[in-house]
């Protein structure tokens, strides 16, 4: 293969990604979804339910964007190679990529024709970059065809490399600009720092911790709190621009802004959240000090009409969930949260406002970046995850896990401390028992329950001889219901079964 031919493959890829970098910079600056992210969102929203559910449970979101970029590498390389002899291929090929990206952008939430401008500019950057690279490559190609090498060939190669460096520079600067200079991202960070919310700092209640090394902290730091959402690029919403619309089966529509919300009577509570995708013994769970405003008074203010049994919540990015109305109105601390652990909500956890409803899995309750609530009935709605086979109501199930020792650990024979956590929000845990090597169940010591809406820690000391051992845990809730041993998958409404760990005493 001639050396200039290889250069065309490379030039096609470099020009293509220069256009993507320019698109990225513009969309970050204007707080719009980029073309690649829009395509990823489109693929997610239009994939079969089985694929979406697999992706949710297997970190599929992490590979979608890289997979799209890999496909683009191949497409751009082919465009570059074909453009060597047929320049119109570059115009048409990059144009086709732009059309697909633009079509995906127009399907994003709140899209207008104006969102096509960054796509168009990115397309021009692609064609322009390949034109510059192609001109230099054409000169090299002419020498290749004539079998002319030596100093003339080396000089033209230097010219080509200078242009490559310039195009790389444009791509790199565009990428950095998108990362660093995103207007609303910077403004949001400044806004969060300047907020003076009427909230208190968290104080961990006395007696809730069992003080065993290896048991996860009773209060989960915000940067360690689990993250599960469908967003490939999380929305950037400013408090000054935020509003919530409450409508549907109500006597009067209500629209409140951020200042209205924080001026209302506040509520603060320790609440444990866990994901419906959490496997038995999994770590998709956390406990935090949430501050906000109760949701029930707002709905009463709107005037709930007879027959309503659901609230369709919508996020700024268009994600939806259907929430049972009863669980909002029954007196639990269902809130519009504005702070987490005494600080404004982090962007990843829904800044400026998200919903928190104790006792329900997040897929039917925990809407981050919430902007709309429609009071309605379940037979009139089809929310994001229920469309994909998940249950309609989503009540949290009783669960427990062994955290100390971990599976595969080696411990000293004799007295061995076993410890972990248990939870069933809005009901509460009354007892936790463990079983060693299939023997009788024995009780454990519980940490104090801060409320029925938080997890509890537990511990026990057992006497073990040298050898391999298995410890199993089960919990009993405040109503006397014992955790089932029956293993069930997370789909459609949460996993069940006892958690066990295998370890060795030496």
Annotate each PLM feature.
Residues 29, 33, 76, 84-89, ...:
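Structured, non-membrane catalytic/scaffold regions adjacent to prosthetic-group chemistry
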């Amino acid at each position: 293969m001639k050396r200039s031919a290889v250069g065309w493959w490379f030039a096609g890829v470099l020009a293509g990604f220069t256009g993507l970098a320019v698109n990225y910079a513009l969309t970050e600056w204007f707080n719009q979804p980029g073309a690649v992210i829009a395509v990823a969102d489109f693929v997610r929203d239009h994939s079969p339910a089985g694929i979406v559910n697999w992706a949710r449970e297997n970190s599929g979101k992490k590979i979608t964007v890289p997979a799209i970029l890999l496909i683009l590498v191949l497409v751009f390389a082919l465009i570059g190679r074909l453009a060597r002899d047929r320049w119109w291929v570059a115009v048409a090929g990059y144009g086709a990529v732009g059309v697909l990206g633009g079509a995906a952008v127009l399907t994003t939430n709140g899209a207008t024709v104006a969102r096509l401008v960054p796509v168009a500019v990115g397309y021009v950057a692609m064609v322009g970059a390949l034109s510059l690279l192609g001109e230099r490559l054409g000169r090299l190609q002419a020498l290749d065809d004539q079998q002319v090498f030596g100093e003339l060939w080396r000089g033209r190669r230097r010219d080509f490399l200078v242009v490559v460096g310039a195009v790389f520079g444009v791509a790199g600067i565009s990428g950095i600009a998108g990362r660093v200079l995103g207007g609303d991202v910077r403004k949001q960070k400044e806004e969060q720092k300047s907020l003076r919310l009427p909230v208190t700092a968290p104080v961990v209640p006395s007696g809730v911790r069992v003080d065993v090394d290896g048991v996860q902290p009773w209060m989960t730091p915000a940067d360690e709190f689990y993250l599960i959402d469908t967003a490939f690029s999380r929305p950037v919403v400013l408090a000054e621009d935020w509003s919530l619309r409450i409508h549907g089966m109500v006597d009067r529509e209500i629209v409140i802004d951020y200042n209205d919300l924080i001026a209302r009577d506040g509520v603060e509570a320790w609440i444990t959240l866990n994901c419906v995708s959490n496997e038995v013994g999994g770590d998709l769970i956390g406990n935090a000090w949430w501050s906000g405003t109760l949701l029930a008074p707002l709905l009463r203010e709107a005037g709930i009409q007879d027959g309503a049994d659901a609230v369709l919540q919508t996020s700024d990015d268009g994600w939806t969930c259907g929430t049972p109305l009863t669980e909002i109105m029954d007196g639990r601390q269902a809130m519009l949260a504005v702070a987490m652990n005494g600080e404004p909500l982090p962007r990843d956890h829904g800044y400026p406002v998200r919903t928190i409803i104790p006792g329900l899995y997040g897929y039917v309750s925990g809407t981050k970046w919430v902007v709309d609530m429609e009071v309605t009935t379940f037979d009139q709605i089809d929310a994001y995850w229920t469309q994909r086979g998940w249950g309609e109501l989503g009540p949290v199930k009783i669960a427990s896990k062994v955290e100390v020792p971990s599976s595969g650990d080696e411990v000293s024979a004799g007295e061995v401390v076993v410890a972990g956590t248990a939870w069933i929000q809005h009901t509460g845990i009354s007892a936790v028992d463990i079983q060693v090597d299939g023997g009788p169940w024995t009780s454990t010591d519980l940490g104090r329950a801060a409320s029925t809406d938080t997890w509890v820690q537990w511990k026990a000391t057992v006497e073990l001889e040298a050898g391999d051992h298995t410890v199993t845990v089960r919990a009993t809730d405040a109503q006397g219901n014992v955790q089932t041993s029956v293993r069930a998958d997370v789909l459609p409404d949460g996993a069940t079964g006892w958690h066990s760990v295998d370890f060795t005493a030496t």
